[in-house]
Amino acid sequence: MKTQTTWIASLLIAAVGQTGAFAQDIRVDMNKVYPEKTIRLDEVASVRYIPLGTTDDVLFNGKIVHLSDEGIAGFNKKEGDILVFDGAGKVVGSFNHLGQGPQDYPQIYHLDVDWKQGEVYVQDNFRQKIRIYAPDGTYLRTLNSQGTMREGDMYHYSDTHLIYYKNPDGRQFAPYQPVTLFSKKDGSATFLPFTKTDENIVKATGGPFGDMKLNAKHVSSLYKLGDEVYVNEVTADVIYRIEKSDALTPLVQRTPSYQEAVGKDYFLVITGANARYYFFKRQQALLEFKGNAATDTKSTFVAYDRKQKSILQPTFIHSDYPSLNITLDKLKQCAGSSNRCFLLMEAFKLKEALAEGKLKGTLQSIAEKLHEEDNPVLMVIEFKK
């Protein structure tokens, strides 16, 4: 045991350059079957609903990436639409700069918003740029990123900086410092003292073009959950939280180690952080193709209960929609206000549930006013301590 402890400590030194006390004693067993539990949201959280505004020009069928009192932002990746709402769901702006011009983006990889500065930051990996617009779509400026950013791993960090996770240079992996603070003013970069020593990417076998690495939708390396930023590092078996001082604090440790043969089947990914729980995904590391799609059949989600100090597989239910089982794969969290998770509820599905008599209370009243073609309703969940 002493040898194993010393070995894990050495990995921490390699990953961050210094040892540090864990913020909490959280250890996730990657091979354990944790107990299942049904939890009433009415007992552990407050719930409210935000119907996203609908106009002829604002139709949302994409991804919400920012949720706060100041506003909500999302994008339709295929169409290139960026949609901005206020905190109550009213449309603030809708724009599309998909194109090849100097003020355009050829594809949206990710975006975030700084409401104080009135700026929307769009990740353009194709050209290694960050395009900056006002919430109404007015073009402001472009910054050159310092290398290629990982898809989805770019966020508003402070009044003066963005933060992103840099991909390795070249085809051959070598240890490097990927966590980058990026000046919003001049594009200068500062690298946090965190060294990445191995790749953490999901792979798939049996594809039409042979074995392949899959993109960041399976395992991101940088997450902004509410107003806190987290770093996943599989080599050191640790998830870190970036403090306001820019220091990295180890938060969660996985067992067995990814370095051991019995630990290589899964990656540990943080998917939620709130006053009551931390949510994690145990991501299957090696997928198999069936036809043209890689299938993920073994990944599981677990929660660490910060009050009970235990790990479980929860299913949440709510009195407004008693027959709806809210599992952790459906519950989302993004950048924005802390302690907020959400469920994206499509209008046509709510109308179907209403017709079947499945809705009650506030959600029933909202559904009665919806049209099937309307934009989704956000079920916003704020957990209690």
Task: Please report, for each region that a protein language model flagged, where it lies by residue.
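Asp-box/WD-like beta-propeller blade repeats and closely related beta-sheet repeat scaffolds
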Residues: 125-178, 191-207
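Blade-loop segments of beta-propeller domains
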Residues: 53-57, 90-117, 124-125, 147
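Beta-propeller blade signature
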Residues: 135, 176-186, 237-240, 293-308, ...
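Structural signature of eukaryotic scaffold interfaces centered on beta-propeller domains
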Residues: 62-67, 110-116, 154-159, 166, ...
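Short coil/turn segments at the loop-to-beta-strand junctions that recur within blades
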Residues: 56-57, 96-104, 144-151, 195-200, ...
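Conserved blade-ending motifs and adjacent loop-strand segments that build the rim/top face
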Residues: 249-269, 307-338
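Blade/loop signatures of beta-propeller domains
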Residues: 24-50
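Loop-centered beta-sheet repeat module
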Residues: 188-245
